[in-house]
């Protein structure tokens, strides 16, 4: 995903983040989710309940003030790109949220991550404004089903 962002001309994830330590931390906190094919991990994301300090201050407005799941660090193995797997993961996340009676999903991405911007809009996420993440502004999105 880091190399794909670079080849797309995006500045997102070009500073050594995310790295193995970040993923290890996600897993130790039970935030990490994997998409597998057989015994091979082909996708990854972090899902965090109600805990993203950067989302407390938004230039704009969230759609809701209810509990939410933050979606971070979605990545697909290079040899599985173009198969709609990020969409599959987002659909699964929506189902997981519904099972937990959570109606709000939030995500952010760089202004130049065209693929993710397109997918979030395609999947019904609404642009809510800008948040500061790791020293830079990000476009913030929410999908609310309440």
Provide a role label for each language-model segment.
Residues 74-76, 109:
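Hydrophobic adenine-recognition pocket in adenosine-nucleotide-binding enzymes
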Residues 2-22:
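Conserved GNAT-fold acetyl-CoA-binding loop/helix
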Residues 31-48:
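Conserved beta-hairpin
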Residues 87, 99, 111-129:
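Conserved active-site alpha-helix within GNAT-family acetyltransferase domains
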Residues 90, 97-109:
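Conserved GNAT acetyl-CoA-binding A-motif
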Residues 76, 82-95, 118-122:
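Conserved acetyl-CoA-binding loop-helix of GNAT-fold acetyltransferases
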Residues 46-73, 81:
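Conserved acyl-donor/pantetheine-binding loop and adjacent beta-alpha core of acyl/acetyltransferases
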Residues 64-65, 122-123, 130-146:
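C-terminal "cap" of GNAT-fold acetyltransferases
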């Amino acid at each position: 995903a880091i190399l794909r962002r670079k080849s797309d001309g995006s500045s997102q994830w070009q500073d050594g983040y995310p790295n193995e330590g970040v993923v290890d931390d996600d897993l130790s906190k039970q935030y990490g989710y994997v998409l597998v094919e057989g015994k091979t991990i082909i996708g990854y994301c972090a899902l965090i309940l109600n805990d993203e300090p950067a989302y407390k201050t938004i230039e704009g407005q969230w759609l809701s003030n209810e509990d939410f799941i933050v979606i971070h660090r979605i990545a697909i193995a290079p040899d599985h790109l173009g198969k709609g797997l990020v969409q599959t993961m987002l659909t699964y996340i929506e189902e997981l949220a519904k099972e937990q009676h959570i109606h709000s999903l939030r995500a952010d991405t760089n202004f130049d991550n065209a693929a993710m911007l397109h997918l979030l809009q395609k999947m019904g996420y609404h642009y809510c404004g800008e948040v500061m993440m790791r020293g830079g502004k990000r476009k913030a999105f929410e999908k609310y089903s309440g």
